[in-house]
From Swiss-Prot:
Natural source organism: Yersinia pestis
Name of the protein in its database record: Large ribosomal subunit protein bL21
Subunit structure: Part of the 50S ribosomal subunit. Contacts protein L20.
GO terms, biological process: translation
Function: This protein binds to 23S rRNA in the presence of protein L20.
One Pfam family in the UniProt entry: Ribosomal_L21p
GO molecular function, a single term: structural constituent of ribosome
Stored PANTHER family: 50S RIBOSOMAL PROTEIN L21 (PTHR21349), LARGE RIBOSOMAL SUBUNIT PROTEIN BL21M (PTHR21349:SF0)
Encoding gene (name): rplU
Length: 103
């Protein structure tokens, strides 16, 4: 059984027991969360596709950890003008473990 849901402006395909990394959620570690923006649920041969959302579809998950991703560097450079600019960025994330999928 797997499902596709939307969180943080992105769509994720998950199955029960899977751990995924989402955009930062303001929920404490160890708490549970319920995602209700479920786009599709597949259970064997039975596939339930929403238009746009599945009625009554819910995904339960547990917050495992919060953190920051690896640093990326943004570099701006103009040739012959002695112009160089460098900036770094680390994106916040939340790791969640999918505990249940229901339609």
């Amino acid at each position: 059984m797997y499902a596709v849901f939307q969180s943080g402006g992105k769509q994720h395909r998950v199955s029960e027991g899977q751990t995924i990394r989402l955009e930062k959620l303001d929920i404490a570690t160890g708490e549970t969360i319920e995602f209700d923006q479920v786009l599709m649920i597949a259970n064997g041969e039975e596939i339930n596709i929403g238009a746009p959302l599945v009625d009554g579809g819910k995904i339960k998950a547990e917050i495992i950890a919060h953190g920051r991703g690896e640093k990326i560097k943004i570099v701006k450079f103009r040739r012959r003008k002695h112009y160089r600019k460098q900036q770094g960025h680390r994106q916040w994330f939340t790791d969640v473990k999918i505990t249940g999928i229901s339609a």
